[in-house]
Design a protein with these regions (language model features):
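Cleavable N-terminal export/targeting peptides
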Residues: 1-30, 107, 112-116, 191, ...
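Outer membrane beta-barrel transmembrane domains
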Residues: 291, 297-423
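Transmembrane beta-barrel architecture of outer-membrane proteins
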Residues: 31, 139-143, 229-233, 281-285, ...
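Short loop/turn motifs that connect adjacent beta-strands in outer-membrane beta-barrel proteins
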Residues: 58-72, 148-156, 239-248, 260, ...
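Short acidic/polar capping segments at secondary-structure boundaries
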Residues: 164, 241, 253-260, 295, ...
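Extracellular/periplasm-exposed beta-strand and loop segments of Gram-negative cell-envelope proteins
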Residues: 89, 122-138, 167-227, 256-284, ...
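N-terminal, post-signal peptide beta-strand-biased segments of exported outer-membrane/organellar beta-barrel
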Residues: 19-172, 421-423
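Transmembrane beta-barrel domains of outer membrane proteins
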Residues: 55-58, 145-151, 160, 233-239, ...
Length: 423
């Protein structure tokens, strides 16, 4: 039997963006910001602030050789994984179609009641998984990278390299496939019972009397696009005193390698085939940011991510647009307690221009001697995604730095991890 079809469909749904996708977001690139609901434009610190506002690394006093505030950090963040994506991942891990294929092969070799029962169970499990996927949004957004923070005396910078993956989709399961699997269940029940239950369904057998591969008749399909954004860059920031206030400006030039997966998966002559293309683009982009500290504890910040827009038209006619995203941040920062609010200034259209998103994020952090406690909330003003609540811990022991976070909301969840070394 052809075991490629359903697993490939599930994999595509894990990595696809269909015509009904939700909008692209500003992005979450580290575990601390994930725990704070995505807040970071004003509330970011010298370790990871460059991801959200390159000006933030300038808010530091003393050279890193004396303060030991610089760090090497490895980041692994899955900021969004929908329930549909979990269902697809479980289906891939369980290899449901492979189980059905093996059961049918065994039955064709030795047609015993036990082999028929194994095939019945496999067909029902596959049907249940397809029903769970039918019409569900399948969304995933994650980041994997490495960074070095270089805080100086009223100035700073960072080096960063990493990849962000964005994938969204909606399955298109044909109802005829459910009928097909039910026919196989009835035919296998007929074999198991010796003809006293089920139905014979001779149309499911070839001229030699062997069961035909059901994958040749499956009609379900999926079409979509996935993005892999890989960046290598540096950030630089400088702090100035203007009219008695500390003002910082920063810039983060970067080289971007963009890979677009644009495919249309469907059955062609009995095989699950892809009609589409994978494209790559290599270009330069830049992030800009500024921040000002007021009355010692208040900070107002503005940042623009990916100043240069990018438009790609794929071979199957989809127009993908990556536009600049701007955010305003407000934070209260003290010795032990930080509270921050981020708001996107514009609606951000999705990659195919069919929906929009505009996030506001609220986060708070309370620091003890070696432990940081974090809570966050994220809301989309356009309603394209549901509200999310998050929490996390930060821990420092000597030079070792660790951050853990978890986020959950309407229809999905995410996790984040950072491992760092202070120097």
């Amino acid at each position: 039997l052809n075991t490629f079809h359903f697993n490939s469909l599930a994999i595509l749904l894990m990595a696809g963006i269909s015509c009904h996708t939700t909008a692209d977001s500003y992005g979450i690139f580290d575990a601390r910001s994930l725990a704070l609901g995505g807040t970071g434009v004003a509330l970011g610190n010298v370790d990871t602030g460059h991801f959200y506002n390159p000006a933030l690394t300038a808010f530091h006093q003393g050279h890193e050789d004396r303060t030991r505030d610089g760090s090497h950090s490895f980041h692994a963040v899955l900021s969004a994984l929908s329930d549909g994506a979990r269902t697809a991942a479980d289906a891939i891990a369980d290899d449901l179609e492979g189980r059905l294929s093996a059961a049918i092969d065994d039955l064709n070799e030795v047609p015993t009641p036990g082999a028929a029962r194994t095939g019945i169970n496999a067909a029902r499990d596959l049907e249940n998984a397809m029903r769970q996927l039918d019409g569900k949004d399948v969304n995933a957004d994650g980041y994997l990278g490495y960074s070095i923070s270089l805080p100086g005396d009223m100035e700073g910078g960072a080096f960063f390299v990493g990849s962000r993956f964005i994938g969204r989709g909606v399955s298109d399961i044909d109802n005829a496939d459910f009928d097909l699997l039910q026919d196989y269940v009835e035919a296998l029940e007929f074999v198991e019972s010796g003809g006293t239950a089920g139905e014979e369904h001779p149309e499911l057998r070839d001229d030699a009397g062997r069961f035909i591969d059901p994958s040749f008749r499956i009609q379900s399909s999926a079409a979509g696009t996935g993005l892999l954004l890989s960046e290598l860059g540096v950030s630089a920031a400088k702090q100035y005193n203007l009219w008695g206030q500390d003002v910082a400006v920063g810039i983060a030039p970067k080289v971007v390698h963009l890979r677009v997966f644009d495919e249309d998966w469907r059955v062609v002559d009995g095989e699950f085939a892809s009609i589409g293309d994978n494209r790559t683009e290599f270009y330069f982009n830049v992030d800009l940011g500024t921040a000002v500290t007021l009355a010692d504890h208040w900070r107002v910040a503005l940042a623009v991510k990916d100043l240069r827009s990018k438009t790609i038209t794929t071979d199957i006619g989809d127009r993908i647009e990556l536009q600049p995203r701007s955010r305003l941040g407000l934070a209260y920062i003290s010795e032990s307690l930080d509270v921050g609010l981020d708001a996107e200034l514009d609606k951000t259209p999705d990659l195919q221009g069919t929906a929009a998103r505009q996030d506001i994020s609220l986060g708070t952090e309370y620091r003890l001697s070696t432990l940081a406690l974090r809570l966050g909330f994220r809301h989309d003003l356009e309603g394209s995604v549901g509200d999310q609540f998050s929490a996390g811990l930060g821990w420092r022991f000597s030079h070792l730095l660790m951050d853990f976070s978890y986020i959950q909301g309407d229809g999905g969840e995410g996790v984040g991890l950072r491992l760092g070394w202070a120097y």
